Amino acid sequence: MGYFQMTRNVEEIFGGVVVAPHQIPFKYTSTNGGETFLSLPFYPITGFVTINSGVQVPIDNFEIDGNTLNLGRELEPGDVVFCLFDKIMSPQDASNNAVRIYKFLSVGGETEFTPDFTAYGVQSLYIDGKYKTPGEDYNYFKTSGKVVLDTALPTGVWVVAEMSIKQNIPALAGNNGASEIGTNSGKSLAESLGTWIDTTIAIFEMTEAPSVIQTRGFYETNDGGAGVWVATGIISPSLAGTHVPSQAKVYNAGGVEYQLNVKSGFEISAKANGVKAVDDVNAETEDFVCLGEAINGITSRVKTMVNDEDLKTYLKVIIPSEYPLRIGKTSIKAYSRLKLDFQQASIYDRPSPSNRQEVTGVYMNAIERGIEDVRAISARFGGATSYSNMTLSDFHIEGGKFYGDHTTDKGVADCSTGTGLFTYNMENSSIRNTWFQGFACGRQYNRTGPGYYFDNLGNKVVGTLVPEVTSSGTGSYEGVKEWSVTAYGCRYLYLRVLSNWARFDNCKFGTYANWSSSPDGNQCEYFIENRGAGVVFSGGVIEANTAAANPTKGFVRDYARGCTFEGVYYENCLSAGWVIAIPEKSQYNRANGLFLTAIGSQFTLSSQGAPLVKFEEGYFGSYNPATGLYKTGGWETNYQYAGGVNTWAVGQPELDSGAFPHGGYDFKYGTYGIHYSGSVPDADSLRDTQEGNEFLSPYGLSVNSGILLFPTLSPAYQSNIVVWYKDLTGNFDPRNIVVGDFDNNNVSDGTSNALYRTNGFNYYDYGNGYKAAIVPYVNPRALDNRMTTSAGRKLKITVTSDAPIILKSIQAFVGGTPIFPPAIKDYVPRSQRDRIWGTMSAGSTDSGAYYGPLVGGGIFRPGDVVLPFVPFGNAALMNPASYTDNSSGFGASAETAVITGGATWGAGLAGATFTLTVESQDTINNWTTVSVPSAYLPYIFTGMPVYITANSSGGSTGLINTVRRVVNSDGTLSNKYVLYGALGAAGTTLTVSTTSSYTVRSGVSSTLTGVSGSFSASSWLGTASGDLRVGFGASGSGTRQTRYYYNGADVSAVVGSSGANALHLTGTGGITLNGSLLTSTSYSFGSASAYPANIYSQNAVTVVSDVHYKMDIVELNDAEIECAKACAKLYRRYKLKTAVAIKGEDGARYHVGTIAQLVMQAFTDAGLDWTKYGIITYESWEASDAVVETVGAVYDEEGNELVPETIMVVTPAKEAGEIYMVRYDEFNSFVMAGQEARLQALEEK
């Protein structure tokens, strides 16, 4: 016969055909011949094959390949193939090598057995060749690995168990065994295999009705649709010869009903329920197999859409990679613990004519646990579901491309599809490698909450979805995960997320579609709406492939509940990137904030760009100057404490503290530190005003017009300069913010003009007029043009009157930027204090040529401390000799001062005189509105008083505070200001002068405060004479003095004054003069009431006796000689009363001298007037109290007293009195003249 055949037949080998307990027979009789292979209904491992009883040699005569038996020759008609197979497996078991045989011969009485290898379940059990039913004849216990029998074994029977040795990989027949196909316990294996036919559709013509039918395919043999169909016992003649996919049922020619055998643990192909490709996805017909019906028919065999039950079962449905498949009669339903593997299938959601939305009123989703499903669950439990029942858990999708029917040439009424994937309360579920295109919405992961719900088109419907959520939500909604999922060309939305801690990796959201060109003109407002907390988007793309495809409001609408977007690229971003939604009162925030990092973006055209982050209008509040009230925003109205870390940031920002002087500009001191170009800007300081405190900071600089230059220091390369401002009209173009605006010739070819020039572009929009612009700093050489006359090192902001702004903060950051500006660290300004604009030259209102890093100027308030300032220029960067003191042109100050009041304009603004006209009075607030001539708008500043020198109505003059500037209805700034006080009726003219200055106090005191104890500018250094003044400007009289503490605690010396003409020096250990004590002839050393006790001198007193200093020089006359002779007899011995009081009567010593009254009498006796001579002096005084000073106690850091409080007598008390004194040098000279006259008279005798 052309092939080798053994001479021994099977009967000779076995002594007759005997089937061993663990062997499975297979017999095939050829009808027409010609077969070279046979398809088996199972997957054998080994086997014994005969043809016409002749044994076939493996490899030579046959091979087993899966479920195919390849023969060594063609069969001839009538040939009989008989096989005995040792073991069979399901397709999955075959591919996973998941089954192992355990067998033994019973000894009798056994009620249990344990295999000698690790197993995870029993697939089938045969005792004495008969199949046993799990749960009835035996039970398997996973923890012990034992198989427990209901009936003890007889002696000498074979027990054969097919054990699962692969965990969680069920066999064809599931957990209960590969051969349990609806048989009764005790049937032989051969009986349990049922009837085999080639195709399922062949059942339609069958007249016989076996209990079990196994098919090798659905439409054709081996087409992948093999299945086991079990008779249900129902006969429906009207359905004879039909297939009902939604129930996975078929009917034979007599109407006998069969249902597809599906059990928990199965991995089954959707082809088993008749899934097949359609010829035309748009065909107006009902005659097609709906993929939704076919899958639902399979899943409904084990799934109920009630989580309590579904979590006990598992099912995987494999959808063929065929093109195209159609969903048109019902959506694919989502169940817990269900996996749908769509592989590479292309699936079109195209409702049939009877299922279009104009007929049903419902837009069909592709995959759903939808609105009606949730309502059905609620109805099943009488409106009292559990948290678990309302949850869709462990639902997974793999692969597939889904296409809806929305295109730009159709309006929504002409379409019938809703959302690609629509779920409520989904948790711990995933979707991977899936594509959605042409739907109203790509995916919606919703939750059942109170107040509203979302429909299939993504519309928000106000109302209650089910009774359970009238007051609070129910069902879980967290842990959704996506990998490489794409949504493309969707009409309204690509993704809505109400799932907490969801994650989306490498997902794509985008379109070429210009939906505005559709009949409805309904362009997407957003691509993504995220309401979940802790949601992460990583490594994806959000793109509008054309400018026309941009969403109308923003790419992402986010509730900022601690969500992260990292490594995301968004393209053609002409709309806002992330729009922050106003919180809802019913929303419980688990965290508060938004974190964006490594965001890539691309602009089309040379536009000002759209903001990266935008807050919905009304999110933040605003101040209404007309009412003087603050209107709260939605965030303030609906805010609930986050209970988590706030993460408002883009990237991981760190302050570039060296980018600007003081780390940035906060406008606390108005114009401080700001240069300008051209004419003086029209600006206002909003410090400590309601307008300034409206948002982001308590300060602000309102700019109506001008070119402002902000000096930089050394910004880091690629530093992000952020300018926060309020756009009063909405017309400000952030491209008017520029850095690096100069010709850079520090390159080798010298040709690169403005190489590092960058413009600002929209960055943040807070929805209440406040915005932020970002200006990248791209110059790697931060010293370029430092301190030269170029504006290259400055941030330049150009403002025009049709687009005024309020500057709030300017800072630079590396590594990212915060969404809200941090406060600048407290600093002390350095300024001249004599001009508003530090760069203004003295003779012109045009800006000067000083371009140093510090420029001074500013608008100050009482209490502000201002440090010294000296401006320097540097014409040549590398030449220190080129540094020039520019004080003559730009002013300077040399001491620290505290502003106490006043105002100053300074430099080119000083000395101007103009008039204001009263427009109206507000008697309630005591305000007066005035108009200002346009030319003098730069001379009036909110935040600084107006100096009124004349009032035509006779009203108030002097420094009058400004309240605010009037804003026009279109947001532009008017020429009207509101001043404090009732200054006159409408039409009153007020004459204004800019000649004024600040009042200040200067100096340093660490322990004293207040006027009487602190230094002030006028007392420290007098401006006229340069005096050191102590006590100048004090409100009353008193002792003024300086004290010296030699050891830090004890007073050793005091210098002071206690009267109009009194200076006292007090030294506890003496007063040392290292120099001559000089005075004029007009002053004395001591006085009648304050005289020294002793004078110690190395030399005698030297008296001026120069003839040029004297007049009326004559010799003594006779009367004077006689008086002198008499005075010689007036020397006496005496004790001083002061010495007796101190030393006592015995201790006091005698002194020799004269007595003033005796000398006076001698002059009188001689007929002379003693008052005409300087020998006797007389003084008298009024009584006075003692002058004392209290020296405070000294304490250590812990409050312990180190030195007690002491009271020091500066000047002792004095009683009223008088005193006569003698000048001994003159008295002795007078006496000597008398003695000489007596000696001469004696000699002449």
From Swiss-Prot:
Give the positions of the site Cleavage. 1105-1106
**Keywords noted in UniProt:** Degradation of host capsule during virus entry, Degradation of host cell envelope components during virus entry, Host-virus interaction, Hydrolase, Protease, Viral attachment to host adhesion receptor, Viral attachment to host cell, Viral tail fiber protein, Viral tail protein, Virion, Virus entry into host cell
Q: Which Gene3D superfamilies match?
A: Winged helix-like DNA-binding domain superfamily/Winged helix DNA-binding domain
Q: Which CDD domains match?
A: Peptidase_S74_CIMCD (cd10144)
* InterPro entries the record matches: S74_ICA, WH-like_DNA-bd_sf
Phosphoprotein recorded as keyword: no
- Which biological process, per GO, is one annotated for this protein? symbiont entry into host cell via disruption of host cell glycocalyx
Example of a GO MF term: peptidase activity
Name assigned to this protein: Probable tail spike protein
Signal peptide position in this chain?
none
Q: Where is the Peptidase S74 domain?
A: 1105-1245
- Pfam families this protein is in? Peptidase_S74
Q: What is one cellular component GO term in this UniProt entry?
A: virus tail, fiber
